């Protein structure tokens, strides 16, 4: 219920931004200026790219969704899948914009019905993500959405989940790409699209 309420608020917020803020998707928008960098968080040496400041800017958020939709509309997507948790934010707004079903990819133990799961590596140990078994149909062309591409481990696991259910990964999209972490190499067989790169700055 909490997730449903959150997604409703996100979509309503997007509706408001769409109505009140004209945003030409062809216009170049400097997203870097809307993303805060927090040094040494969550541990020393890490430059954390904080998208909460982007989300507080309705024009920037609207621009992101327009760019994603413009890129993927010609690709005959049938479903949008958002990765917990920030992928839900962009995935919900994009699903609304493209008039497509939204599928949630969640951490282990968060989905109530029958699921399939996929393990992926962490810095120390492993974790799992899950998807409802009935969320993807054979042949579905699925666009997977997350906020940021780092090492690519979570997105790779999400792609595996879609493929376990005989879906087709039609694309993987992100707001932020961190090229120095080489996530694109792990996902090179897929169509990748991101809006802004942070290369160690």
How would you name each of these model-derived features?
Residues 3-8, 65-69:
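Short, amphipathic alpha-helical "lid/cap" segments that border enzyme active or binding sites
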Residues 7-34, 156-201:
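PRPP-dependent phosphoribosyltransferase catalytic core
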Residues 20-77:
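Active-site-facing substrate-recognition patch
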Residues 77-84:
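Short glycine-rich phosphate-binding loop at a beta-alpha junction
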Residues 89-98, 159:
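Short Gly/Thr/Asp-enriched flexible loops that form oxyanion-binding sites at enzyme active sites
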Residues 98-99, 119-123, 187-191:
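Short, hinge-like loop/turn segments at secondary-structure boundaries
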Residues 103-143:
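Short, glycine/charge-rich flexible loops or terminal/linker lids adjacent to PRPP-binding catalytic cores
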Residues 147, 152:
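Conserved G/P- and acidic residue-centered "switch" motifs that form tight phosphate/ATP-binding loops
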């Amino acid at each position: 219920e909490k997730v449903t309420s959150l997604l409703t608020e996100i979509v309503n917020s997007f509706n408001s931004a769409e109505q009140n803020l004209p945003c030409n998707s062809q216009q170049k928008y400097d997203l870097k200026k809307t993303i805060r960098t927090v040094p040494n968080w969550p541990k020393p040496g890490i430059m954390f790219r904080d998208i909460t400041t982007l989300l507080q800017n309705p024009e920037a958020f609207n621009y992101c969704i327009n760019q994603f939709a413009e890129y993927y509309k010609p690709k005959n997507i049938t479903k949008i899948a958002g990765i917990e948790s920030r992928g839900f934010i962009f995935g919900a707004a994009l699903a609304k914009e493209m008039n497509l079903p939204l599928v949630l990819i969640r951490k282990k133990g968060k989905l109530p019905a029958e699921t399939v799961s996929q393990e992926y590596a962490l810095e120390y140990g492993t974790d799992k993500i899950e998807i409802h078994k009935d969320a993807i149909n054979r042949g579905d062309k699925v666009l997977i959405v997350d906020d940021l591409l780092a090492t690519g481990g979570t997105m790779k696991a999400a792609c595996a989940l879609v493929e376990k259910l005989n879906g087709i990964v039609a694309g993987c999209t992100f707001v932020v790409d961190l090229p120095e972490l080489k996530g694109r190499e792990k996902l090179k067989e897929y169509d990748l699209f991101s809006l802004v790169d942070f290369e160690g700055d």
